[in-house]
Amino acid sequence: MSILLSLLASAVWLVSYDSLGVNRLTAAEDPYAANLIEGGRLGQVLVNYKVENGVWQSLDGRPRRQDGSRYTDTGLGEALVLVQDFEQQADGGFHWAITLENRSPFPIFVGDLAVCIPWKSGGEAPEEIFERSFIKHAFISGDASFLYFTRYSGEAPYLMLVPDKGTPLEYFSTQQRRQYYAYIRSAKSGPQESRGSWRQPHTGETLQPGESRQYGFTWRVAGSYPEMRDILYRSGSVDIRVVPGMTVPRGQEAVFALRMQDAPDSLRAEFPEKTRLRLRESHGDTHLYEVCFEQLGENLITVFFGNGRKTSLEFFCSLSPKELLEKRSAFLTQHQQFRDTGRWYDGLYGVYDMAAGQLRGPDNPDYFDERLTYFLASDDPILGKAPFVASKNAVWPDPSEIESLEYHLEHFVWGGLQRTDEEHPLEYGVYGTPNWYINRHQDLRATQTDYKLETTRTWRTYDYPHVMMLWWEMYKIARDYPSLVRYAPAEVLLERAYQTARVFFLYPKQLLGEYYEPFKWGDYNELLIPDLIDELERCGQPDKAAVLRGQWERKYRYFVYEDRYPYRSEYAADRTAFESTYALARYGLQNGLDPAAARDFMERQHYANLACRGVLEHQWYLLGSDFFGSSDWSAMSYMARMGGWSVLDYGLRYADDPYDWIRLGYASYLGPFGLMNAGDEASGYGYWYPGKEKDGALGQAFTSAKFGRAWIGTEEGRGPWRYCGEGDLGMCAVTRTAAAVLAQDPCFGWVLYGGKLSDDGDRFRFIPEDGVSRRIYIVSDALRVGLSLERGHWSAEVPVVVEKDLSAVRLSVLSDAEAPAILRFECLKGEAVPAVRCGGKSLPAAQDRYGRYCFTLPEGAWAEVDIRLR
């Protein structure tokens, strides 16, 4: 028998049952009629209990009775009875009640009480994936817990599961990919998993003879993210907002807002002696708190509210972004580079095992010689490292690190990983997996595979943008600091960046076109191609710029016009796409390519990006994090920051209501710094793996579960994966994302992302501490402006001064480059024309093709700049 409950109430849900439980849960307004639990059942409840001091027993209910709008499931045990009621409510909720009753004459201790939440997580065809499959989001944090599900396309409606008051969630486990258990009580299963760590207590409860206890959840339908926040508030839970994120540099202030029906009773810091926590203000049902951490690593703030209820905010306190940039780059060049002229991989930046404290390579492979051999000397785990080091040195040059990069280029890249300009055909081609040495030696290659042995293995699209970025960043170092570069002059490095970008669009399609589609897939780091185009034009090479522009615009046309769901890369649905999708949409708007179509695509890709990103989950490893299908085993990969760049830039430039996206984008920027093992002497030089010899190591991603198996094959306790692997790809996005943002936030008032804000009455003062010190944005409802530097940095000693009426900005610029610094001003919303004075003299302005005002600052190490806006 099947019952459609939505016909009996408000037409919000389509629900049906079979003999095993609820087998359909569909929002009635869903245009695709997607069944969230297709192939699964709601109603599976795990109960482990003891009668007095007896042995553990289990109870598993099964369906018993259907009665009109209600569905009752009773599990009959000799001592403990489980009753489940599913009922459509008049307010549109679909309620799931669970009752436990002790029918024995003895006390019963309930050690586990968990509900299984199935969901349809994928499919084959694009329509099945993007329209009828879902990504699970979960915030497991006591009495403020919830789950929600987003379609892969990001299109509403969104489905929420909100616990009733008195139904806290404290733990989760994932036995299979679609078998997610959310625990109300976990005193048995939690400690039973002795591997890994967990930040919340594992509790149980005792039922006296004749006593019963009820728990419950309500399914809700939401049409937007603000509506999901309202659902949490109306349900008696907590709507949380935070700036600048849940990963906070030491000494910088974070502010969080708690919107809730029950005012907080108290807040408790995990390390009260090293935490400054205070209530800033309350207005109505919203309470703003300021917090500043001195204890490096994870920090809990526990919120007590509503007569015994509680939830925890999981923060991470890191070193400053600049310190972390420097530590990571130094660690790579000092501890992760092989230098042995007798080895074919001389110059390689290898992968580092934080747990063992060992550098892995082809002759020290750990288990990577059995599977994932590419992990050691090719592919994304390797090719993101040198571009990151180069990008850091294009901003903060270090002669020893530049020498390391030149050694890498000379001994590993040019003529090894990458074919030279004299190796015809396929000059500038980049060798793929398992490594360039095997692919250059046909006899070795034949021992690995018999696939396309007649074809040169330079077809992997993803490799090309990494190598292009390496040449591009090396070019910028040579352009701005020519005395520090000995490997090749700037013009040679620019040529190699151009040629690598050119063949990126050619060779993969030419050699393996049945699989690789460079015009149809998003590839990390390819967003730099428009910058390369602009530089070629500036350097008097318009023909080369035109070649790349033609290819980039071909890709733009495909993404905007030819594919409804171009959110793929290596997988049919792939979060890797969400750097390229936004970059292409922005290119269309900046260059006047059908602005209406470009803007429509920008909005669609933005919400698809949010679908695989933690938006409402306020734990440092989930807020702003990316994940695929769910965050259970893997979160905070390279796309947290790479895709987070697009969220932040969208908020700064294009969003009608920017503040949610600035918050989220900045959280995505800061969050992955928590994957770094870095500290000072007092902290043991690393929260995750202490030891000075590991200061600057990095984890590829984060295991959210107490214990899990990473896809790279390692077993990981909750925390960063032990190998750096692809994590340095995320570091590649630091220098293009970092900014100080002064925003007039409707929730928090004037706030500063990337520094400490001082209010002097008529003006604001701050020193940018974002890690790069080359970008400042000022955002209000009426005006948005951006200031950026090519070469040089904002002063680390003299503060930026901004008049509160936004009529003037005063900057101090420090330049160590061997060419003049260029200041750029852009008005992103409203009207503002800058008048710039430096050293008492007016500076002439030139406007570039994007409408930015460009000012060349006088040569010298120091410049005081006054900007008047009119």
Describe the residue ranges of each PLM region.
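Beta-strand-rich N-terminal accessory domains
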Residues: S10-Q179, E193, S197, P201-E205, ...
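Low-complexity, acidic Ser/Thr/Pro/Gly-rich terminal tails and inter-domain linkers that flank the onset
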Residues: T72-A90, G223-R241, H793
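Short, hydrophobic/aromatic-enriched beta-strand segments in well-ordered soluble domains
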Residues: F86, I98-N102, G210-G223, F305, ...
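Short acidic, flexible loop segments centered on an aromatic residue
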Residues: D112-S121, K188-G190, S194, A269-K274, ...
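Low-complexity, Pro/Ser/Thr- and charge-rich linker/hinge segments at domain boundaries
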Residues: G123-E127, D230-G251, T311-D353
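Solvent-exposed, low-complexity, repeat-rich "mucin-like" stalks and linkers
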Residues: R213, R241-D265
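Catalytic domains of carbohydrate-active enzymes that cleave complex glycans
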Residues: Y215-G216, W344, L348-P399, S404-P820
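C-terminal beta-sandwich/jelly-roll accessory domains of carbohydrate-active enzymes
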Residues: D262-E298, F304-G306, G727-G730, T737-R870
